[in-house]
């Protein structure tokens, strides 16, 4: 050990295990998978716990993250690999870094799905209510949902936790409200139409003016 390059491996801060556990700081991404870790029992299954230098693959990411070695054609584990050996967007979890920042430092070799929420279409409110007058020409997204039979009858005890759709009543706008005209407006319009017909008859010579 020298003064210029001291050996600090025996020293550790109290917050380092937390950083390794929550954010995987100072960990080699190519480190091997821990053979003691069991996803069912969690961190207790590994004798080293959060201080383990190897990977603890969570069950939510099991066989969902694309193997970066497979992308390069260099993976030697074949079917024994704990990562996904296919580029299926439906199975890939969303990249949290890209969602928060709008870019990814690992692109184009990122193992997670990059979803641009700004480019996604909004759901059609009319369709969710039960009918969209625009039909296939609608510029918004039509998401097919199964209507809740209990809600259609009148009440669903599950409320917001129900897996089926609860269509909501939309308050009609001002232009869609039924307008009731008064009798005086109707009579005035009839008188105007009668005057117009009489004037046309005079012009055409059907009625003689004395």
From Swiss-Prot:
This protein's GO cellular component annotations are: nucleus
Q: Which SMART domains match?
A: ZnF_C3H1
Pfam families xref list: zf-CCCH (PF00642), zf-CCCH_2 (PF14608)
InterPro entries for the chain: CPSF4/Yth1, Znf_CCCH, Znf_CCCH_sf
**Where are the annotated C3H1-type zinc-finger regions?**
28-59, 61-88, 89-117, 118-142, 143-169
The Gene Ontology biological process terms listed for this entry are: mRNA processing
Q: List the Gene Ontology MF annotations in alphabetical order.
A: RNA binding; zinc ion binding
Task: Give compartment(s).
Answer: Nucleus
Q: Which UniProt keywords apply?
A: Metal-binding, mRNA processing, Nucleus, Repeat, RNA-binding, Zinc, Zinc-finger
Q: What domain of life does the UniProt record list for this protein's source?
A: Eukaryota
In which family does this protein belong, per the annotation?
Belongs to the CPSF4/YTH1 family.
Question: What's this chain's function?
Answer: Component of the cleavage factor I (CF I) involved in pre-mRNA 3'-end processing.
Name recorded for this polypeptide: mRNA 3'-end-processing protein YTH1
- Encoding gene, per UniProt annotation: YTH1
């Amino acid at each position: 050990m020298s003064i210029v390059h001291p050996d600090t491996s025996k020293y550790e801060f109290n917050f380092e295990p937390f950083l390794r556990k929550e954010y995987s700081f100072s960990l080699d991404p190519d480190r091997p998978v821990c053979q003691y870790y069991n996803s069912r029992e969690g961190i207790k299954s590994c004798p080293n716990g959060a201080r383990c230098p190897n990977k603890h693959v969570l069950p939510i990411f099991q066989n969902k993250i694309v193997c970066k070695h497979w992308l390069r054609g260099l993976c030697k584990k074949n079917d024994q690999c704990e990562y996904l050996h296919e580029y299926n967007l439906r199975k890939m979890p969303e990249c949290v870094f890209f969602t928060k920042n709008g870019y990814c430092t690992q692109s184009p070799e990122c193992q997670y799905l990059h979803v641009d929420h700004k480019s996604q279409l909004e759901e059609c409110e009319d369709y969710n209510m039960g009918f969209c007058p625009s039909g296939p020409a609608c510029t918004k997204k039509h998401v097919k949902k199964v209507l809740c039979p209990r809600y259609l009858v009148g009440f669903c005890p599950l409320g917001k936790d129900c897996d089926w759709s609860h269509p909501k009543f939309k308050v009609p706008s001002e232009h869609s409200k039924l307008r009731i005209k008064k009798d005086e407006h109707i009579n005035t319009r009839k008188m105007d139409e009668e005057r117009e017909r009489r004037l046309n008859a005079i012009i055409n010579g059907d009625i003689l003016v004395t």
